Amino acid sequence: MNNVIDGKALANEILSELKHEVQRLKDKTGESPKLAIVLVGDNPASIIYVKNKIKHANKIGIDTLLLNLPITIKTEDLIAKISELNLDQNVSGIIVQLPLPNSIDKNKILSAISPSKDVDGFHPLNVGYLHSGIDNGFVPCTALGCLEVIKKHEPNLSGKNAIIVGRSNIVGKPLSALLLKENCSVTICHSKSQNLSSITSKADIVVAAIGSPLKLTSGYFKPDAIVIDVGINRIGGNKIVGDVDFENVKSKVKYITPVPGGIGPMTIAFLLKNTVQAFKIYS
């Protein structure tokens, strides 16, 4: 049995459904969803991510608008640009590509996006909805992608012991809320957690999202664990690896996602799913 989860194939299923839905919406309304992407500066990794998002959006019929702004832009000027996008009736969703330069107040920027267009799910109102168990807002795309992969391979999550290694607002915290809603027992670990392997080795599900290349070796997992690797780390020049020592772990566990080709494609699929949802709400 092949236990390596093909995130690209799962994402393509979602994108195929979305393509049909976008066409139906276009036939019905005469309009297409539109995703505005704000990119500040010229971080090479960010440019690659943005190009990827635009490519997949256009492939399924979602229009895109890229605002590439200078690294010198001030917080208040960036907020003004976002306010224009909030008012633009042709724009369904808005994302700001992270990370932002240190000179910009990230929290002010994310809070400036209209919650109804916040398809990344980072606005405080949407965060509040998620952690209150209210289904009104948008949920961060990587967390949604992780949950979808987990549920595809373990449909009944009730009572499962899930460990998330990483407490970011992008993955760790939102995914903990989603797994709690599925009645998992959830533990969040982080850089200050002690005896990490003794915690993770008891878990049914382990999500690694710490940004530390190949950190979690086979001793961190029990044999029937589901391992979701969210890490994207560049080593030795151009090689991309996850937070899990994939080659030595894959033969031990029940299921594992690779890097690349695991959660990355799912993140884009759910970003575009959120964008279509925003369009439907608005129209």
From Swiss-Prot:
GO terms for molecular function: methenyltetrahydrofolate cyclohydrolase activity; methylenetetrahydrofolate dehydrogenase (NADP+) activity. This is Bifunctional protein FolD. Homodimer. NADP(+) binds at G166, R167, S168, S191, I232. It comes from Rickettsia bellii (strain RML369-C). The lineage of its organism: Bacteria, Pseudomonadati, Pseudomonadota, Alphaproteobacteria, Rickettsiales. NCBIfam families: PRK14171.1. InterPro entries: Aminoacid_DH-like_N_sf, NAD(P)-bd_dom_sf, THF_DH/CycHdrlase, THF_DH/CycHdrlase_cat_dom, THF_DH/CycHdrlase_CS, THF_DH/CycHdrlase_NAD-bd_dom. Catalyzes the oxidation of 5,10-methylenetetrahydrofolate to 5,10-methenyltetrahydrofolate and then the hydrolysis of 5,10-methenyltetrahydrofolate to 10-formyltetrahydrofolate. Keywords: Amino-acid biosynthesis, Histidine biosynthesis, Hydrolase, Methionine biosynthesis, Multifunctional enzyme, NADP, One-carbon metabolism, Oxidoreductase, Purine biosynthesis. Belongs to the tetrahydrofolate dehydrogenase/cyclohydrolase family. Coiled coil: none annotated. GO terms for biological process: L-histidine biosynthetic process; methionine biosynthetic process; purine nucleotide biosynthetic process; tetrahydrofolate interconversion. The gene is folD. GO terms for cellular component: cytosol. It catalyses: (6R)-5,10-methylene-5,6,7,8-tetrahydrofolate + NADP(+) = (6R)-5,10-methenyltetrahydrofolate + NADPH; (6R)-5,10-methenyltetrahydrofolate + H2O = (6R)-10-formyltetrahydrofolate + H(+).
